[in-house]
A protein has these predicted regions:
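Conserved small/polar residues in nucleotide/adenosyl-binding loops
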Residues: 146, 446-453
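Conserved beta-loop-beta connector loops within the AMP-binding
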Residues: 315-333, 352, 370-371, 433-437
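Conserved AMP-binding/adenylate-forming core of the ANL superfamily
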Residues: 13-57, 61-65, 82-87
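Gly/Ser/Thr-rich phosphate-binding loop
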Residues: 228-233, 242-301, 313
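Conserved pre-ATP/AMP-binding loop-to-beta segment of ANL
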Residues: 127-145, 152, 175-181
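Conserved AMP-binding A3 loop
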Residues: 24-26, 141-165, 295
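Conserved AMP-binding/adenylation subdomain of ANL enzymes
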Residues: 164-181, 189-230, 240, 244
Length: 457
């Protein structure tokens, strides 16, 4: 199956997207066909790369599906990047065209998405030819840029198979039904929002509820207005909602999923206490399309991202010989149909993370328990080394979160001329709580080893 075929056979009258406007599956299919014809008339062909820089909107989906249905390659770009950063990606990807919802100064041809929509709706361009017979599911359909496990932004080459399989793997655990209404507050340009919300919804003919604002009030109002049933978000949003939402505001939601970063246990607990719903934490990375694991509702555990998805293999690489001993920290490696083809035109960078047997080294430090559940410790590059001792920022952050009134915290390594690095923590208090350095230090001294305590707060 090709990624643009995932919404075929849906009831044409059922709702595909809502929010700013209602779009049925019949209208979606027609819009994609019109965009496809217009883009072909503009010269887009198989293998061309097309940049897409927009906020969450229905037209993002039209463009995405139209481009890949031509055998071309879509390059979704973070719409918070400035012109210079966007131009770097476009030049690196050798893009033939940029489609955007705002003006940008870049070195490739540009068309405003509103103009493209008008042309697709009114020009009646000649019908684009069918896909070449030799196009396969192993062809690249998307370049998703990431800093990856090393260095500067690189384009992860994601194939049709990668995306389709990851949607199938993910929704084997997080169940979608046609009657579900799925909140789309995650950015569509990001592989997390793209796969888990947009593609997951379309594959199962659910309704995408599009929201651009990340305001807790707007999220709550949208959930209530559209009777959202599945909410997929990032930890900071759960943190905000746990402090502000009314318990009754989430009564229509049967599934909450968190990803993009580790969900602090105090946040998960606060959310559960307020709304009575557990949050299924997942783990992934762009190079894996992106989902690798998720916590099932049938066998929930705290502080874990769950076992690997069906069809995904994982292992922990350590410096110890012999069989893996549960609880041992090492680097997570992943293998499966969801793993990228490689980095765009960077074979040497690809070799650093992807071996000949298909194992992707994630750059994440984890351990697994006897049941195969994955526990994220930290990014290798975030590891703090002080006097030769390894310090995991996540462990220090979890300790600081135990202090009453702490809303958010981040722990980083700071250069230290004597010890190599020292531990610095940045803390944001909840409304109504004063910052109390002595209290935080007392908790730290009680629960952490001496070298893990913060040099500065």
């Amino acid at each position: 199956m090709f990624i643009h075929e995932i919404f075929k056979n849906a009831d044409p009258k059922s709702l595909a997207m809502t929010g700013e406007s209602n779009v049925t599956y019949g209208q979606l299919e027609k819009a994609v066909e019109n965009y496809r014809n217009t883009l072909h008339a503009m010269g887009i062909r198989r293998g061309d790369t097309v940049g897409l820089y927009t906020a969450n909107r229905a037209e993002f989906v039209y463009v995405y599906m139209a481009v890949v249905s031509l055998g071309a390659i879509i390059v979704p770009i973070n719409n918070s990047l400035v012109d210079r950063e966007v131009d770097f990606i476009l030049r690196d990807a050798e893009s033939k065209l940029l489609i955007s919802d705002m003006p940008l100064t870049v070195s490739v041809p540009f068309i405003d998405i509103h103009d493209l929509d008008y042309r697709a709706s009114t020009e009646n361009a000649p019908k684009a030819p069918a896909l070449p017979a030799d196009l396969t599911e192993d062809d690249v359909c998307a370049l998703i840029y990431t800093s990856g496990t090393t260095g500067s932004p690189k384009g992860a080459m994601i194939t049709h198979k990668n995306q389709v399989r990851n949607v199938e793997q993910y929704t084997a655990v997080v169940r979608f039904k046609p009657e579900d209404k799925v909140l789309c507050v995650l950015p569509m340009f990001h592989c997390y929002g793209l796969t888990t919300v947009v593609l997951g919804s379309l594959y199962h003919h659910s309704t995408i509820v599009i929201l651009r604002s990340k305001s807790p009030t707007e999220i709550i109002n949208t959930i209530m207005k559209y009777s959202v049933t599945i909410a997929i978000m990032v930890p900071p949003l759960y943190n905000l909602l746990a402090r502000r939402g009314e318990p009754s505001s989430m009564k229509t939601v049967h599934t909450f999923v968190s990803g993009g970063a580790s969900l602090p246990q105090p946040v998960a607990q606060s959310f559960y206490e307020r709304f009575g719903h557990p949050v299924q934490e997942g783990y992934g990375l762009t190079e894996a399309s992106p989902v690798v694991s998720i916590l099932p509702t049938a066998k929930p555990k705290y502080l874990t991202s769950g076992p690997a998805l069906p069809g995904v293999e994982v292992k922990v690489i350590t410096d110890k010989e012999g069989p893996y001993v549960p609880g041992t920290v090492g680097e997570l490696a992943v293998r499966g149909d969801n793993v990228m083809k490689g980095y765009w035109k960077k074979p040497e960078e690809t070799k650093k993370v992807l071996d000949k047997d298909g194992w992707l080294r994630t750059g994440d430090l984890v351990y697994m328990d006897a049941d195969g559940y994955i526990y994220i410790v930290d990014r290798i590059k975030d590891l703090i080394i002080m006097n030769g001792e390894n310090i995991y920022p996540g462990e220090v952050e979890d300790c600081i979160y135990e202090v009453e009134g702490v809303g958010e915290c981040a722990v980083v390594g700071h250069p230290d001329p004597l010890r190599g690095q020292s531990v610095w923590a940045y803390v944001v208090m909840k409304e109504g709580f004063a910052f109390d350095e002595d209290k935080i230090r007392t908790v730290s001294y009680t629960h952490l080893r001496a070298h893990e305590t913060c040099a500065d707060l």
